[in-house]
């Protein structure tokens, strides 16, 4: 093989790796009610010292643009950051600068599958968009809406490349102008506002090849996509033991999107929140690996306990509230990139317990590709060794036999969990 061929293969290998180079620890810096509290950007500043002390490397901020819904998930004038219910454009820039001073990078919540229009067209349909600038950027019409979104489209756009969305017009992401102007906007969020990366909302709404385009054209420091599909359930209403199809779909999406993006590990969340309810046998797959995405492609998996949708006041798929720390004991000791939720850290009084776990992770160098050796996985007990450095126990069972070597000491513990190092 000549040197050019070797270089080409090396470059291809590098391009398929996630963009972040050092172990990341993500924090979701808002909940479903944050937009209603007034001045969220300014109030979040007060949290920065605690987040820095907990080893947070990236904070996920809410959608920054003008939106019909106060939470930001029905955006319209994408460049208009002064109309956000979370605060002004300058307040956002100041917040990001304050995070940067502590070495914490900021992710914007990118909501681009759909978009709300500014006014009606001649048919009386809301499908005339404005970008929020004095010029014509993102001033789109009905031809920029997916053809099969018949409630809004004029029938001249492309068919939707993903799943439909009923609450607002589905944008035609196969349109080169859409791709160009959305990429320009995201790059503006980086250069003008200071964002470092992205959390992509509802990535099922367009083909993964579209996500690849936006990744290539904006080159974020870190990016994660929300591909939320239901796990499979049995007739008893409980999750099926085998969720390989579910985690396989996440892996396929990541690879189809170019391999440089991560995905929220909804598989691990679904299994874990069932497992902590006396079914810890779920936490090992037939190959002896973790059963979620972290068991097959951990370097591209972002693990979490809850977010603004699953938890908060929406509670669409909440983790058992009395088992949350068992959940954090799992994700903060295991591979993947863990994400900590604002509510748990600040509102639930769990800051110290979570910070102890994150410090153990940091000082032992546990990262997204760490190895896991599962020592026990039964109804009331889960024990695993990570990187041959630390051991974690989850569950009420106290008799561990000889599972924990005598040279390890308890680094932290709580209700039905403990970590040794």
Swiss-Prot record:
The keyword Zinc-finger does not apply. The keyword Ribosomal protein does not apply. SUPFAM superfamilies: (Trans)glycosidases, Glycosyl hydrolase domain. Its EC number is 3.2.1.1. GO terms for molecular function: alpha-amylase activity; calcium ion binding. GO terms for biological process: carbohydrate metabolic process. It catalyses: Endohydrolysis of (1->4)-alpha-D-glucosidic linkages in polysaccharides containing three or more (1->4)-alpha-linked D-glucose units. Pfam families: Alpha-amyl_C2 (PF07821), Alpha-amylase (PF00128). Its cofactor is Ca(2+). Substrate binds at residues 73-74, 199-204, 228, 230, 255, 289, 308, 314, 393, 420. Binds 3 Ca(2+) ions per subunit. Keywords: Calcium, Carbohydrate metabolism, Glycosidase, Hydrolase, Metal-binding, Signal. Residues 1-23 form the signal peptide. InterPro entries: A-amylase_bs_C, A-amylase_pln, Alpha_amylase, Glyco_hydro_13_cat_dom, Glyco_hydro_b, Glycoside_hydrolase_SF. The record marks 309 as: Transition state stabilizer. Ca(2+) 3 binds at residues 149, 168, 170. Ca(2+) 2 binds at residues 130, 133, 135, 139. It comes from the Eukaryota. Ca(2+) 1 binds at residues 113, 160, 170, 205. The active site is at residues 201, 226. Monomer. Belongs to the glycosyl hydrolase 13 family. Binds starch not only at the active site, but also via accessory binding sites on the protein surface that are important for efficient binding to starch granules and thereby increase enzyme activity. This is Alpha-amylase. The gene is AMY1.1.
């Amino acid at each position: 093989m000549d040197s050019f061929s070797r270089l080409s293969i090396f470059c291809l290998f590098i391009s398929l790796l996630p963009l972040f180079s050092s172990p990341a620890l993500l924090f979701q810096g808002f909940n479903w009610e944050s937009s209603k509290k007034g001045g969220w950007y300014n109030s979040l500043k007060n949290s920065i010292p605690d987040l820095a002390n907990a080893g947070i490397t990236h904070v996920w901020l809410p959608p920054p643009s003008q939106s019909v819904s106060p939470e930001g998930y029905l955006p319209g004038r994408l460049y208009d950051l002064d109309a956000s219910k979370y605060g002004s454009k300058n307040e956002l820039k100041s917040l990001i600068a304050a995070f940067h001073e502590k070495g914490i990078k900021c992710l914007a919540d990118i909501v681009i599958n759909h978009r709300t229009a500014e006014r009606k067209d001649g048919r009386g349909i809301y499908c005339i968009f404005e970008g929020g600038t004095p010029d014509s950027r993102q001033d789109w019409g009905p031809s920029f809406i997916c053809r099969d979104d018949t409630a809004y489209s004029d029938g001249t756009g492309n068919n939707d490349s993903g799943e439909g969305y009923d609450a607002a017009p589905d944008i035609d992401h196969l349109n080169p102008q859409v791709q160009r102007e959305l990429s320009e906007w995201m790059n503006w969020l980086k250069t003008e506002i200071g964002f470092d990366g992205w959390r992509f909302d509802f990535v099922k709404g367009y083909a993964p090849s579209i996500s690849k385009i936006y990744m290539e054209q904006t080159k974020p420091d870190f990016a994660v996509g929300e591909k939320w599909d239901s796990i499979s359930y049995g007739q008893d209403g409980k999750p099926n033991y085998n969720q390989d199809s579910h985690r396989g779909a996440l892996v396929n999406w990541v690879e189809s999107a170019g391999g440089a993006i991560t995905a929220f590990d909804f598989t691990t969340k679904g299994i874990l929140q069932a497992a902590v309810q006396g079914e810890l046998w779920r936490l090992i797959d037939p190959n002896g690996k973790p059963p979620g995405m972290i068991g097959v492609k951990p370097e591209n998996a972002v693990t979490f306990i809850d977010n603004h949708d699953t938890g908060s006041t929406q509670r669409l798929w909440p983790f058992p509230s009395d088992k949350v720390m068992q959940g954090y004991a799992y994700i903060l000791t295991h591979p993947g990139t863990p994400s900590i939720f604002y509510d748990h850290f600040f509102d639930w009084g769990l800051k110290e317990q979570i910070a102890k776990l994150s410090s153990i992770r940091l000082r032992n160098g546990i990262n997204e590709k760490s190895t896991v050796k599962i020592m026990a996985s039964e109804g009331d007990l889960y024990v695993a060794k990570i990187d041959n450095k630390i051991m974690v126990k989850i569950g009420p069972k106290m008799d561990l036999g000889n599972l924990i070597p005598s040279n390890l000491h308890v680094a932290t513990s709580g209700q039905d969990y403990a970590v040794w190092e």
